[in-house]
């Protein structure tokens, strides 16, 4: 038999079993379409999940914290030596120690509170901390330091004389203009409430220091990751903490051999693919790590 005969025989057989042939072809088509749809849904879910995570911050940022306990031998210290070691790791773009404190702010009769982050400002843009209005802060002076607040800070001020009613206009805009108002900062609420203590000469003096701020700009709160926060030079915030030790909890040096250590260090990976490898090296050195990249990797 020739090829044409085989072809003709196939057509005859197909014509005798039209229903079965159509159903088979239709089933295969539906199966292929289902596979394509499932793959598309999976890719779409991954993309949507990634967008949601990225809205909370950078997928290439790693938070490094001290070991949870000191049992089982020598404890890794999160100090300047460790910071330098992190900087030398392959794939690392930027590293900064993070000093943290909480302070009270005053603008006229309005009061607010802010979480302060003292960082190496030269690394700020690597961690997506940059001004959306104004400019990056410098070191400023001891009595009038420069600071950059998040763009939700103004709306958080409230009036203590009106049962802490938020300082907002009728249209919902903040009454406090951070970039053009006089803003003062203190770590002692008594400074704001008018309470005083007796000085050495018997006169009434405020218990804590009051600083007049120079606000250089406003940055994004990154989907509430840094809600009502301020960023300033790390050294300047360390000076404040030292000068206001009565109102800010101090880290004990007994367990660190007298060395200055940090509660938090930020590490920025140059590429997303490097995050897990860098985090593993840091964990192997005895530290704890956390990254939004961990959440993303968990659904892959």
Mark where each language-model region is:
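Conserved beta-strand edge residues that scaffold enzyme active sites
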Residues: 28, 100-101, 296-297
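Juxtamembrane loop-helix boundary motifs flanking transmembrane segments in multi-pass membrane proteins
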Residues: 2-6, 74, 78, 291-298
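N-terminal Sec/SRP start-transfer signal
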Residues: 1-35
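Alpha-helical transmembrane segments
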Residues: 33-61
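Hydrophobic C-terminal alpha-helix "anchor/cap" residues
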Residues: 14, 53, 85-87, 282
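Peri-transmembrane interface segments
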Residues: 49-52, 258-300
